[in-house]
Structure formats: C-alpha cells, structure tokens
UniProtKB/Swiss-Prot annotation:
Encoding gene, per UniProt annotation: greA
Protein name stated in the entry: Transcription elongation factor GreA
Gene Ontology MF term list: DNA binding; RNA polymerase binding
InterPro entries named among the record's database cross-references: GreA/GreB_C_sf (IPR036953), TF_GreA/GreB_CS (IPR018151), Tscrpt_elong_fac_GreA (IPR006359), Tscrpt_elong_fac_GreA/B (IPR028624), Tscrpt_elong_fac_GreA/B_C (IPR001437), Tscrpt_elong_fac_GreA/B_fam (IPR023459), Tscrpt_elong_fac_GreA/B_N (IPR022691), Tscrpt_elong_fac_GreA/B_N_sf (IPR036805)
Cysteine-cysteine disulfides: none
A Pfam family recorded for this sequence: GreA_GreB
Entry-linked NCBIfam families: greA, PRK00226.1-2, PRK00226.1-4
Amino acid sequence: MSTEKTYPMTQEGKQKLENELEQLKTVRRKEVVERIKIARSFGDLSENSEYDAAKDEQAFVEGRITQLENMIRNAVIIKDTGEVSTVVTLGKTVTFKELPNGDEEAYTIVGSAEADPFEGRISNDSPIAKSLLGKQIGEKVTIQTPGGEMQVEIVSVK
C-alpha cells in the first residue's frame, strides 16, 4: 500500500498544474541555465551575486518541478456529477450567510493543491471548509477562524 500523500483536485486544477509544469520544464529551466552561463562569464564565482541568484532560482525551479510531478502523479480527481446536492462536499460551491448581519459569502471547496482564496477556492483543510463539509442547506454552523468565532447559515450548495 502506498504511503504517499494524495492530492484531491478538480480536473481543471490538475490541468493548471500540468500547464505550470510544462512551462517550467520548457521555458523557465532554459532561461535559468542561460542566466547561469551569463553569470559564469563574469569570472570569479566566489563573489558573483548574479551567479548565486541564478543558482538559487535554479534550485527553486527544480524543487517546484519535483513538487508538481508528485502532486500530479498522486492526484485524485474530484468528479463533478452535476447532481443537485444539499450537502457540502469537496468540489462544491457553498454559499453561506453570516449571522446575525446576513452578509453572504461563497467558496468552492477544493484540495490544497489548487486552493486560491482570492479566486474563491478554499482548501478542504481550512477552518471554514472543515466546519462546512458534510453539513446541509439550512444548517447553522459555528466556524472557528484565526480571527475568532463566526456563526453562519448554509444557503446553497452547487
């Protein structure tokens, strides 16, 4: 049995990672190698900040390539069945209103590999998602956040 971590994600999220990996392997890797060549041409490497910066960037790019390959290899695709659901599950967009003020927020709950709060995609490991997963429309939920406790009511699940 494999002990490697799995990465739940949508097909769209996996495609984004594959695109980033391709870009790193075909474009960024070559750019960094070229920067290293240029920096080497400046002579003494012991005091060559351009060379050090290029080597640091190379280490970052290679590390990210390894990370992406691992995430893609261990991806578990969240299938959107298209079925209407009343229960909050991974891959669904949940709308809730804060109590008592009624302000509404909506988030799509995804795996950590494709989470981007600025795009409304939160990780299933986040405090908000952990509190909402498995709950139903109409349920009132208390969410523990770093900023304190928040009461919400689930309005819709898509």
